[in-house]
Swiss-Prot record:
ATP binds at K46, G53, R54, G55, E99, S102, E107. HAMAP family: Succ_CoA_beta. This is Succinate--CoA ligase [ADP-forming] subunit beta. GO terms for molecular function: ATP binding; magnesium ion binding; succinate-CoA ligase (ADP-forming) activity; succinate-CoA ligase (GDP-forming) activity. It comes from Vibrio campbellii (strain ATCC BAA-1116). GO terms for biological process: succinyl-CoA metabolic process; tricarboxylic acid cycle. The lineage of its organism: Bacteria, Pseudomonadati, Pseudomonadota, Gammaproteobacteria, Vibrionales.
Length: 388
């Protein structure tokens, strides 16, 4: 689950990190009043969406009047912001962040992720702030400095000092950086984060450090024990189909192809997408129905897949391990009837009672294309999609 910039900064402030004075606003009038509370001559106004590239898309502006801030809010609130990280429809803007402008002398980068290879939280710092860290890692990896946090002992001050020295910080800046580093390390573990970034972490004209931007991603598997963070969830930033799927405990990701995929198991789902690609097709989605492929969940999965007008055929690929294939076949038949599926449906069953499952499909009054193998299924569904 992603957080907005203003939410990330709220958490930063909670852990004693320096952030600009700012206010998240729902209306143009609120933005106008917020600008009046900020004492700096210039104010920064930012659209709050779960996507990067806001500045280049016109979603971040500098204003020196309250009326200018209000006009910006009137322009964007209720509209969609399209950036290089969004689709053509963009992301809806429901909040505007109004904050004090900062006197920037230098820009740094500071971020942290879970390194699954070492099973540690790894902090990354660089003097190349304000640009995509992926680009820095590709072109000048020597400019990225790392510190691995042992989960048994947590972040240590000496690690923060080492990073500060490598960034060329001096004097009181080192103490400030260590405080930021320690706060972020504690926050990462306490809130079950998967990723956090401060890009840029700036050095102001007065020589102080300031968290000018914030990006936080929370491990969705841990949200059950993070009620405070759950309340920060903004469903408007999610694909409607993905949000609907989550309600049924279906793992769905929308793609831009024309072959709908319904599979049980994430690994099998990825393999299914690969083989569809291999045979010239383009998957329209990733959808894992999980181990409990009941009639109800299969029906909802069909509804979600078919809500995409680009879908011309559906491939159902089920491995019967926990559940029996004959039961799954009956669920598929019932779901196809209930939903009123009008596109070709190719079904491949393997595992427990697979032969019986195929027999159930063959004896049904529903027009379903049976496949003997995964390759056969991919070839048939690609051909069916091309024929539509």
């Amino acid at each position: 689950m992603n957080l907005h910039e203003y939410q990330a900064k709220q958490l930063f402030a909670e852990f004693g990190l320096p952030v600009p004075e700012g206010y998240a606003c729902d209306t143009p009038q609120e933005a106008f009043e917020a600008a009046g509370r900020i004492t700096t001559e210039k104010k920064v106004v930012k659209c709050q969406v779960h996507a990067g590239g806001r500045g280049k898309a016109g979603g971040v502006e500098l204003h020196d009047t309250k009326d200018g801030v209000k006009e910006f809010a009137q322009k964007w609130l209720g509209k969609n912001l399209v950036t290089y990280q969004t689709d053509a429809n963009g992301q809806p803007v429901t909040k505007i962040l109004v904050e004090e402008a900062s006197n920037i002398a230098n820009e740094l980068y500071l971020g942290a992720v879970v390194d699954r290879a070492t099973r540690k939280i790894v902090f990354m710092a660089s003097t190349e702030g304000g640009v995509e860290i992926e680009k820095v890692a590709e072109e000048t990896p020597e400019l990225i400095h790392k510190a691995a946090i042992d989960p048994l002992v947590g972040p240590q001050a000496y690690q923060g000092r080492e990073l500060a020295f490598k960034l060329g910080l001096e004097g009181d800046q080192i103490k400030q950086f260590v405080k930021i580093f320690m706060g972020l390390g504690t926050m990462f573990s306490q809130y079950d984060l998967a990723l956090l970034e401060i890009n840029p972490l700036v050095i102001t004209g007065e020589g102080n450090l300031l968290c000018l931007d914030g990006k936080i991603n929370i491990d969705s598997n841990a949200l059950y024990r993070q009620p405070k963070l759950r309340e920060m969830h903004d469903p408007s930033q999610e694909d409607e189909r993905e949000a609907h799927a989550a309600q049924w405990e279906l793992n769905y990701v929308a793609l831009d192809g024309n072959v709908g995929c319904m599979v049980n198991g994430a690994g099998l789902a990825m393999g299914t997408m690969d083989i569809v690609n291999l045979h010239g097709g383009k998957p329209a989605n990733f959808l894992d129905v999980g181990g409990g492929a009941t009639k109800e969940r299969v029906a909802e999965a069909f509804k979600i897949i078919l809500s995409d007008d680009n879908v011309k055929a559906v491939l159902v690929n089920i491995f019967g391990g926990i559940v029996r294939c004959d039961m799954i076949a009956e669920g598929i038949i019932g779901a196809v009837k209930e939903v009123g599926v009008t596109v070709p449906v190719v079904v491949r069953l393997e595992g427990t009672n697979a032969d019986l499952g195929r027999e159930v499909l063959a004896n049904s009054d529903v027009d379903i294309i049976a496949a003997e193998s995964l390759t056969d299924a991919a070839q048939k569904v690609v051909a069916a999609a091309e024929a539509k």
